[in-house]
Amino acid sequence: MYGIEYTTILIFLISIILLNYIVKSVTRIMDYIIYRFLLISVALFALTRAQNYGINLPITGSMDIVYANSTQEEIFLTSTLCLYYPTEASTQINDGEWKDSLSQMFLTKGWPTGSVYFKEYSSIVDFSVDPQLYCDYNLVLMKYDQNLELDMSELADLILNEWLCNPMDITLYYYQQSGESNKWISMGSSCTVKVCPLNTQTLGIGCQTTNVDSFEMVAENEKLAIVDVVDGINHKINLTTTTCTNRNCKKLGPRENVAVIQVGGSNVLDITADPTTNPQTERMMRVNWKKWWQVFYTIVDYINQIVQVMSKRSRSLNSAAFYYRV
């Protein structure tokens, strides 16, 4: 009799222990499932609701002025457009409200009032000294001038590409270019650049290092000069530092938030001759209208097609920066 009672009690205790183990196991499994579900839910919520901090940004190059991170909304609702035009345009139009009129026309194309900025420059040469492109999309209008064709080409090469630059101390050091993507960019009110290539003994090749007059002149009285010399050879450089700044730059690739629209001329400027320049005909365009109203009307009409061949950027160009990425 006592044996049966002891057996019953033992079975009862074992059942309680087993049930307790099962309950704890089920609890642990449920906790794991619940925590995993919550973790996945939070992660998905963050990905679908948070701002885009670079996942879909098409350009990895950067500049020294940061804009807000882009979102997944329509570009025309959150983007800014800068239109750079010569003084000649506003002089010819001669209407104090022409910008307001164009803003209303851009509104019909999906660009809200206040998202389009009109920026005037006096001449291509002056614009070359300090180009500053601050908007998400930048359209630079250049009136074709046969006498300024080379200046226009150099400016287009500068603003249609990204450049990583360092300052140069030409009084202390010799410099050499490491490859085709390496150029020297000079900017200022007057840049005359002379170079003297050196041999391995630092003696001048065809020039005297102590006689500046014997140096080869590669730019004269320019406001913007992109200098290319023979790679792998040290050069002694001479220029007037009071009126010109020289930088050692490397071309990184196309700056896809900038487009150049050439006004007039028989052909679109070709900057693809440089082997480091990717074909950029899509962002080099030409319109042949004699009147500036007609030019701006055409731009308004095709603005959305134009920006489709461009890419929005998170940073801007500011050539005034000392250590900068332009």
From Swiss-Prot:
Specify whether Membrane is a keyword of the entry.
no
Query: What is the recorded post-translational modification?
Result: N-glycosylated. The N-terminus is blocked possibly by pyroglutamic acid.
Quick one: signal sequence residues?
Answer: 1-50
Q: Which UniProt keywords apply?
A: Calcium, Capsid protein, Disulfide bond, Glycoprotein, Host endoplasmic reticulum, Host-virus interaction, Metal-binding, Outer capsid protein, Signal, T=13 icosahedral capsid protein, Virion
User: Does Metal-binding appear among the keywords?
Assistant: yes
**Residue span of region CNP motif:** 165-167
Of the GO CC terms on this record, one is: T=13 icosahedral viral capsid
Q: State the disulfide connectivity.
A: 82-135, 165-249, 191-244, 196-207
Q: Where is this region: GPR motif?
A: 253-255
List glycan-bearing residues: 69, 238
Which positions are annotated as binding Ca(2+) 2? 177, 228-229, 231, 301
What's an example of a GO molecular-function annotation for this chain? metal ion binding
Query: What's the further remark here?
Result: Some rotavirus strains are neuraminidase-sensitive and require sialic acid to attach to the cell surface. Some rotavirus strains are integrin-dependent. Some rotavirus strains depend on ganglioside for their entry into the host cell. Hsp70 also seems to be involved in the entry of some strains. In group A rotaviruses, VP7 defines the G serotype.
Q: Assembly and interactions?
A: Homotrimer; disulfide-linked. 2 Ca(2+) ions bound at each subunit interface in the trimer hold the trimer together. Interacts with the intermediate capsid protein VP6. Interacts with the outer capsid protein VP5*.
Q: Tell me, in a sentence or two, what this protein's role is.
A: Calcium-binding protein that interacts with rotavirus cell receptors once the initial attachment by VP4 has been achieved. Rotavirus attachment and entry into the host cell probably involves multiple sequential contacts between the outer capsid proteins VP4 and VP7, and the cell receptors. Following entry into the host cell, low intracellular or intravesicular Ca(2+) concentration probably causes the calcium-stabilized VP7 trimers to dissociate from the virion. This step is probably necessary for the membrane-disrupting entry step and the release of VP4, which is locked onto the virion by VP7.
Query: What family name appears in the similarity comment?
Result: Belongs to the rotavirus VP7 family.
What is the protein's name according to its record?
A: Outer capsid glycoprotein VP7
> Which organism is this protein's natural source?
Rotavirus A (strain RVA/Human/Australia/RV-4/1977/G1P1A[8])
